[in-house]
């Protein structure tokens, strides 16, 4: 495989003469903010243990399936968790793509989705329904330091090594590398795209900045669900992965790291003949749904491939047309030393 350091795509087309000083100004702001939080200013502690799942860079690290994994672990340990998130990309009065995905994946788990997560959680805990909730999972919580946490998990996309990256807007980093010193646990994601030598090298490089344990995780497809548009809605059919080999597909995405998504598709033998890419969290339009539907009226036309994060938004569009097929991978995360994560979670819940 190629060196993962070479896989970091350019985050911006703006010339370095513009982005370099902007990144420098950004670093001044983030360093000032972190110094205040390090001193405990503006940090509140809840009367429940808090587990944060976050990252060092902009989107695409795999936070959502990791949140689901943590929530299920907590449930297996007998806890009743609540997910707290900002609700990025959601219109007023509507649910965002990540909230909808959470609701499908971990049905019944309460979700606080608002910019002021602290106020939302306090309001929930003061209610009758919130009394039994005993642990908080912060989705994208590494930079949301207003809430003290008992376990700070930081995800790093192995295909975007942070020591080969730069601060926003010149690069993808939301914080400098030294911020990894706050992490209690670092998890390298998307390692299925690296060989063992590359993984070992990256673990060593990350460990220079992170005194915490560094685990590795693979994103896997357990199968795919094919949704077919019918007169009164969508029908769903679970299809085994081996049936997808050599299948031609169109792809559409509005996610943080679409290249990782496309790479996984190709690893499973799918032939991506076209990719329609939008910005992270962007909404799909009725005209786009109509165009994709019209394209599938042709003989032997390929189905559309989408992540579940995109599908929860797109399925509500009304212009698809009958007979349209959309393929959605069932994504999960495998952690190499998963017992270490389980012990960390259990320890936090017992001691908090």
Which role does the model predict for each range below?
Residues 1-51:
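Extreme N-terminal, non-catalytic leader segments
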Residues 303-309:
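Acidic beta-strand-to-loop metal/phosphate-binding motif
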Residues 222, 278-283, 322-352:
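Short, flexible loop segments at boundaries between secondary-structure elements
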Residues 53, 112, 156, 217, ...:
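Hydrophobic residues at beta-strand termini and immediately following loops
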Residues 79, 86-210, 216:
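Phosphate/Mg2+-binding loops and adjacent switch elements
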Residues 34-90, 192-193:
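Walker A (P-loop) phosphate-binding motif
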Residues 70, 74-75, 102, 206, ...:
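Hydrophobic alpha-helical packing residues
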Residues 2-6, 161-302:
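C-terminal accessory "lid"/substrate-recognition subdomains
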């Amino acid at each position: 495989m190629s060196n993962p350091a070479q896989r970091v795509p350019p985050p911006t087309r703006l010339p370095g003469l513009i982005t370099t000083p902007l990144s420098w100004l950004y670093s001044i702001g983030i360093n000032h903010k972190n110094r205040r939080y390090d001193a405990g200013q503006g940090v509140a502690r809840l009367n429940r243990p808090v587990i944060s799942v976050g990252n060092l860079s902009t989107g695409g690290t795999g936070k959502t399936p990791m949140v689901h994994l943590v929530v299920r672990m907590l449930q297996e340990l007998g806890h009743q968790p609540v997910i707290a998130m900002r609700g990025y990309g959601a219109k007023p009065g509507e649910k965002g793509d990540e909230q909808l995905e959470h609701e499908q994946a971990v049905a019944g788990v309460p979700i606080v989705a608002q910019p002021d997560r602290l106020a939302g959680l306090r309001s929930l805990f003061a209610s009758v329904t919130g009394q039994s909730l005993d642990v908080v999972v912060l989705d994208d919580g590494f930079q949301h330091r207003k809430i003290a946490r008992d376990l700070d998990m930081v995800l790093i996309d192995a295909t975007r090594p942070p020591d080969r990256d730069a601060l926003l807007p010149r690069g993808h980093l939301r914080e400098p590398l030294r911020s990894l010193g706050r992490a209690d646990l670092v998890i390298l994601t998307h390692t299925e795209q690296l060989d063992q030598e590359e993984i070992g090298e990256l673990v060593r490089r990350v460990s220079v900045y992170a005194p915490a344990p560094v685990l590795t995780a693979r994103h896997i497809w357990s199968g795919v669900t094919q949704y077919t548009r019918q007169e009164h809605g969508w029908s769903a059919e679970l299809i085994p992965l081996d049936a997808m080999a050599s299948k031609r597909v169109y792809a559409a995405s509005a996610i943080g790291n679409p290249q990782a998504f496309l790479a996984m598709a190709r690893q499973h033998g799918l032939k991506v003949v076209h990719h329609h890419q939008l910005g992270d969290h962007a909404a799909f339009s009725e005209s786009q749904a109509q165009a994709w539907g019209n394209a599938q009226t042709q003989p032997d036309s390929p189905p559309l491939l989408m992540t579940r994060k995109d599908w929860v938004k797109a399925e509500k569009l009304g212009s698809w047309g009958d007979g349209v097929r959309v393929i959605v991978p069932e994504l999960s995360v495998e952690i190499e030393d998963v017992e270490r994560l389980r012990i960390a979670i259990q320890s936090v819940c017992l001691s908090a």
